[in-house]
Amino acid sequence: MKRWDRGGRPQFNEFNITEHAESTDHPDDIWNTIHNQVIQAVKDVSNRYMEEVGCQQQWPYSNALEQVRLKHYQVDQNDRFDEHADVGDHASARRFLAMFFYLNDVEKGGETKFEHRSIKPVQGRCLAFPPMWMFPHSGAAPITEDKYIIGTYLHYV
């Protein structure tokens, strides 16, 4: 795990699942298995998103998945991610859909907050949203238990 501690912009531990899966020679490695499961989940969530939003005709024909990352927000470190947009420079401008897969319930705190909505972390759920400047959000510090998510982005190719 790599520690990010920029005083809330961001502040959490991160493990790059894609990097690890691509660096192993063992196809039955647990991280390869997890990586493949996440890829399938991204496809399923993308299809549901297109149906619910009604954007099948506008969906980018050519797209790819950014690296898959496990993020750990610790209660005792006041880990959080203050308000930001996930597209903020040329390198991130190809992102068009963010996905956060919640791996555990957090009783208090840990919400992903948008201007008019707050999403509570619930195990097994996925939050998908456009990562552009029109959707600034924050990751509140968990209060009762650590928060674990797997995050990735779909991007243009």
Predicted segments, located by residue:
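Fe(II)/2-oxoglutarate oxygenase catalytic core
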Residues: 1-126, 134-157
